[in-house]
Amino acid sequence: MTKLKMLSMLTVMIASLFIFSSQALAVQYFTVSTSSGAPVNMRSGPGTNYPIMLSIPSGSRVPYYCYAYGTTVTGKYGTSNIWDQIQWKDSRGVVNIGYVSDTYVYTGSDGPVGYKCN
């Protein structure tokens, strides 16, 4: 194989790594809300058995990362055992990553959206 051909193949492989890794890093934003306007609880894991980390004001737009299965909850958008991993920056500027029931997150879908959390 010639050096030029080898260099061309290597260039294509490196370029494809950048294309696919940038797609994997794309973050979606969704709105969390309750029917009553009460805050939404963010938990340390995907279920009501996990501790509440903080409460997010209803109507807030949050970065969404992935989903996991956990406790079944009934909320504004139905009944589901899907929990969404999201991010929230609290009043002190501390960034928190935790889980909110999908029944309080408007994703536009009744099923899982995006990637399953590891």
Swiss-Prot record:
- Keyword annotations from UniProtKB, A to Z: Signal
| Coiled-coil region | none
Record bears the keyword Signal: yes
Report if keyword Cell inner membrane is assigned.
no
Q: Where is the SH3b domain?
A: 30-104
Alphabetical list of SMART domains matching this protein? SH3b (SM00287)
Gene3D superfamilies in UniProt: SH3 Domains
The leader peptide range reads: 1-26
Family to which this protein belongs: To B.subtilis YraI.
Q: What is this protein called?
A: Uncharacterized protein YraJ
Species assigned in the record: Bacillus subtilis (strain 168)
Gene this protein is translated from: yraJ
